[in-house]
């Protein structure tokens, strides 16, 4: 007699031809799985949502919607969470289309290398999560064809309720193939294929080999698996919304099975009442100093609470069972992953136990077949009400992997690729981004990397660089961009007075001109902001006279408030005045002498690059406007001219995607910044979305960022930037952002200790640690590292 076998069951080593007992599937037909025990189930794949991207109200609505689903769902259901290597095939297909249409050699090379890089991450590090709901057939039919017709109604109802709470269910072109491939991952992990099997079920699912003799793991076709469960008393007393999220993000090789079993109210209420009464009677006999007094008191209160919620609030009573599958390629790696999941459970208040001598039973319980073993279920079941069951909501993922986005790098939480689609308005209320990072953290590197990848996807990019603009030149010119240097000694010039459009109607190219607002008056507002920067002491009287001088200057060129005066008979825009043309009109007013002298420095003096006619082609798809060569007193002026030009360019149409990148935004909004110029930038940030554009700002001086007007500029910019990237920061600056973004202590510490090129990516309440990744060609074009540059010079 073997005592171990009597106590724990007999684990048999299955050899070829003896592994069929592991497969409880009899047949698959019409999207239905027929089991050998006579039961039927159907499986629906559910696409997750970024729960923490939602507002608090949206989160509550999602949980309420999921509770409504549970109310209408069958009494028993299973939720499966699988971790798999990331599937980035759709993203790579898009890169291929960009590669085929790209003419610039360097861009083609970078697109090719990016595709290789993303594919490498997906194969070696990248993970994705798949979510499934398993529903049983509860009707009376016995034939699978009849079952398929009836269970389809159940699946349709479930789909409608899930969609009502924001979840989308996947509709596969061939449901039977989907189910076969899903099950192959469990039974034949290294034989999974998208093709239909050559043999009939269940032979097609039967593993070639399986070893179930181990007390702590089984081995299916060389894949080692161990099974753990959350013990019935191992759950926290109170849980928050989406409390199942930590399990979802557990990491590589971790799958989760949640089984919910609803109990009849008529059956469960008497049990709850009797148990509460029994515990109350025991409480009378227990002194309040005994160790178990509080446990009994809590049990009484819990029983009364559950009874009240069921009777008065209409909640249902469920048993929840959670089984965790850990997979690895060796017993050593399996043990390491087991330790990780045990630590994760402990850190989140859960008590996790290993299913020793029950691994084969746990294996069957974890299959997406709703076949939980009775022993496993009794050891792991926990009673919960509808509200707590709905709050489980495991269909939440920290992944940021948009199919049509820009590749950022690696998600350090779960090793998935980070791909962000700034233009997806269904996911992000706006695609604007604020980037923070101390000197040397990789801020400029990231900005250029983002800009080049946007350019490679057909986005028109404008970069404004008030500091160290030369760092952008090499990459800009290598991809066919236009580098514009605005400053002393430069021949490049942009005329602020130039009017570049004949209507303010952004939709005029599609629906005709319906907006008669004066383009001239709109331009004059910008000119006045420029003079506020140029001559901060200007008085209201001087502003009035300046206004007259500007109007008279435009009138001399045949331009009035009437938009029709902007073009000649051929329909082309007329020649526009510049500051050199404005000076004679200003000199007619002696009261403007001081203002005129300030302007003359831009026309005749050392800063003449700011006052002449536009002499460069500004229609390139990638433009860098470098104002860093200007002296400190003119930096804000040059940056404003560049920003005003960009606003002009992006507001012509909203058909094409555009991106505006402003580095060192504190130059405009810092302590010595100009409030009107800051308001101009804020207005641009607020309106770019309507132009089909995004605005990306960056700074290494967080304190200065919030210095102007008690932080008005910084707050407005953060409030209108759905995405934030926090690279490494000094402690004082990280603490400042902690207040503004409500970061936790651990998140703040993470930002302070981040390595170069690492940071915290925030999208709403969803925050992930990310490592920026570039290809070799991108790195060579972007890097400002002295040693890397020296190596390149030596090589050349």
Model-derived regions, located:
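Extended, folded cores of ATP/NTP-driven motor/assembly subunits in large transport
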Residues: 2-397
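Post-Walker A helix-loop "phosphate-sensing" segment adjacent to the P-loop in P-loop NTPases
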Residues: 160, 452-462, 481
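Hydrophobic positions on the alpha1 helix immediately C-terminal to the Walker A/P-loop
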Residues: 446
């Amino acid at each position: 007699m073997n005592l171990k076998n009597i106590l724990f069951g007999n684990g048999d080593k299955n050899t070829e031809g003896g592994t069929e007992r592991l497969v409880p599937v009899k047949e698959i037909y019409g999207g239905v799985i027929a089991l050998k025990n006579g039961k039927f189930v159907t499986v629906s794949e559910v696409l997750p949502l970024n729960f923490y991207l939602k507002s608090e109200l949206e989160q509550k609505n999602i949980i309420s919607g999921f509770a409504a689903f549970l109310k209408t769902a069958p009494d028993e259901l299973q939720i499966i969470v699988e971790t798999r290597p990331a599937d980035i095939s759709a993203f790579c297909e898009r890169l291929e289309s960009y590669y085929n249409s790209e003419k610039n050699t360097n861009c083609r090379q970078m697109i090719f290398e990016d595709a290789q890089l993303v594919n490498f991450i997906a194969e070696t590090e990248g993970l994705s999560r798949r979510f499934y709901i398993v529903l049983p057939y509860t009707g009376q039919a016995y034939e699978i064809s009849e079952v398929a017709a009836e269970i389809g109604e159940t699946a349709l109802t479930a789909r409608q309720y899930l969609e009502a709470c924001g979840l989308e269910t996947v509709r596969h072109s061939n449901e039977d193939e989907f189910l076969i491939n899903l099950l192959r991952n469990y039974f034949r992990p290294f034989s999974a294929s998208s093709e239909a099997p050559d043999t009939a079920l269940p032979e097609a699912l039967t593993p070639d080999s399986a070893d179930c003799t181990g007390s702590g793991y089984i081995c299916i076709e060389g894949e080692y698996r161990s099974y753990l469960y959350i013990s019935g008393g191992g759950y926290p007393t109170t849980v928050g919304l989406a409390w199942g999220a930590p399990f979802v993000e557990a990491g590589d090789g971790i799958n989760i099975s949640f089984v919910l079993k609803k109990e009849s109210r008529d059956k469960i209420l008497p049990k709850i009442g009797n148990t509460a009464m029994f515990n109350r009677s025991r409480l009378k006999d227990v002194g309040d100093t005994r160790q178990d007094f509080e446990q009994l008191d809590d049990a009484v209160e819990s029983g009364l609470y559950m009874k009240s919620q069921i009777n008065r609030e209409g909640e249902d009573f469920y048993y929840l069972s959670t089984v965790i599958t850990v997979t690895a390629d060796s017993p050593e790696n399996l043990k390491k992953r087991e330790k990780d999941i045990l630590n994760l459970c402990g850190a989140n208040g859960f008590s996790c136990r290993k299913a020793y001598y029950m691994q084969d039973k746990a294996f069957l319980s974890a299959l997406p077949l709703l076949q939980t073993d009775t022993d496993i279920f009794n050891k792991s079941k926990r009673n919960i009400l509808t509200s707590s069951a709905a709050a489980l909501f495991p269909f939440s993922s920290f992944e940021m992997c948009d199919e049509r986005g820009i590749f950022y790098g690696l998600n350090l939480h779960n090793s998935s690729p980070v791909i962000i689609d700034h233009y997806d308005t269904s996911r992000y209320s706006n695609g604007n981004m604020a980037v923070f990072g101390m000197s040397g953290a990789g801020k400029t590197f990231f900005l250029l990397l983002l800009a080049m990848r946007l350019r490679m996807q057909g986005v028109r990019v404008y970069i404004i660089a008030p500091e160290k603009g030369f760092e952008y030149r090499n990459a800009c010119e290598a991809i066919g961009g236009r580098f514009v240097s605005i400053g002393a000694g430069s021949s490049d010039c942009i005329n602020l007075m130039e009017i570049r459009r004949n209507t303010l109607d952004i939709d005029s190219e599609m629906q005709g001109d319906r907006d008669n607002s004066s383009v001239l008056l709109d331009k004059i507002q910008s000119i006045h902001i420029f003079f506020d920067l140029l001559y901060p002491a200007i008085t209201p009287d001087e502003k009035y006279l300046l206004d007259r001088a500007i109007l008279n200057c435009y009138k001399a060129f045949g331009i009035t408030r009437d938009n029709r005066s902007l073009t000649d008979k051929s329909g082309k825009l007329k020649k526009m005045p510049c500051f050199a043309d404005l000076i004679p009109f200003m000199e007619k007013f002696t009261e403007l002498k001081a203002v005129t002298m300030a302007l003359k420095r831009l026309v005749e003096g050392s800063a003449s690059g700011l006052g002449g006619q536009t002499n460069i082609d500004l229609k390139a798809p990638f433009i860098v406007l470098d104002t860093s060569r200007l002296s400190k007193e003119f930096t804000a002026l040059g940056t404003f001219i560049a920003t005003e030009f960009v606003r002009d360019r992006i507001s012509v149409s909203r058909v094409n995607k555009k991106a505006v990148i402003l580095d060192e935004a504190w130059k405009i909004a810092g302590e010595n910044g100009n409030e009107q110029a800051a308001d101009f930038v804020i207005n641009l940030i607020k309106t770019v979305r309507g132009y089909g554009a995004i605005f990306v700002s960056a700074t290494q001086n967080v304190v200065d960022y919030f210095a102007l007007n008690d932080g008005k500029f910084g707050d407005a910019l953060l409030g209108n930037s759905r995405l934030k990237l926090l690279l490494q920061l000094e402690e004082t600056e990280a603490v400042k952002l902690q207040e503004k973004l409500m970061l936790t202590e651990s998140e703040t510490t993470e930002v302070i200790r981040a390595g170069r090129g690492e940071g915290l990516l925030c999208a709403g309440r969803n925050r992930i640690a990310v490592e920026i990744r570039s290809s070799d060609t991108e790195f060579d074009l972007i890097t400002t590292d002295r040693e890397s540059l020296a190596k390149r010079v030596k090589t050349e």
